[in-house]
Amino acid sequence: MLRFGITGKSGAGKSTVAQLFEKYGVVHVDADKVAHNIYEPGTPCAAEIAAHFGPDVLLPDGSVDRRSLSAIVFSDAAQLEALSAITHRYVGEAISQIEQRERAAGAKGLLIDAIALIESGQKGAAVIAVTAPYEVMLSRIMERDGLSEEEARRRLDAQKEEDFFVSHADHVIVNNGDAGALEQQVDAIARKLGLCQ
């Protein structure tokens, strides 16, 4: 089973690209969704986050308040690093379990979709970076996450520069909003990775 990764800034279109790869029998693992699960009440990760950031980052049910935590980490690079140090281990363990399950089920490939793909060590056999114009990413995350422009800018600016993702990538996809061009780029990479003829 081929394991590969997709990365890029928030709002670049990683999930859209990952969905296009699914037609090749690839299972899409969204690290953000995995993180949602490890933030649930009573999980060791939620407890460790509360121990580091304080009880105010927990909701009454004991789950991690992602909005509250985001306000802290996207305004302080050291706090973002601390959160990454806590979560990468738990996300990595969860992804390993998913990989074992999907391998046993006969999946053709596993595509890990993560902003912190490089730093977390989850990249696999190949890395695909997705890029998009800054203003496009800004508008996408404002709409998707219900953020103000200031919050969205702070989030984007707290992330690695686009050059970081591109320099660590084996393949680069430019997502300027043209669905046909996006699909052509995915198809070309799928051929290079041996997912199709």
Q: What residue spans do the PLM features occupy?
A:
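Walker A (P-loop) ATP-phosphate-binding motif of ABC ATPase nucleotide-binding domains
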Residues: 3
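Hydrophobic anchor at the beta1->P-loop junction of P-loop NTPases
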Residues: 6
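The conserved Walker
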Residues: 10
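Walker A/P-loop
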Residues: 15
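Post-Walker A helix-loop "phosphate-sensing" segment adjacent to the P-loop in P-loop NTPases
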Residues: 22-31, 43-44
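ATP-dependent small-molecule kinase phosphotransfer cores
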Residues: 33-107
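Small-molecule kinase domains that catalyze NTP-dependent phosphoryl transfer to phosphate-bearing small molecules
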Residues: 95, 123, 143, 147-192
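ATP-dependent NMP and nucleoside kinases share a basic, alpha-helical "lid"
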Residues: 96-144
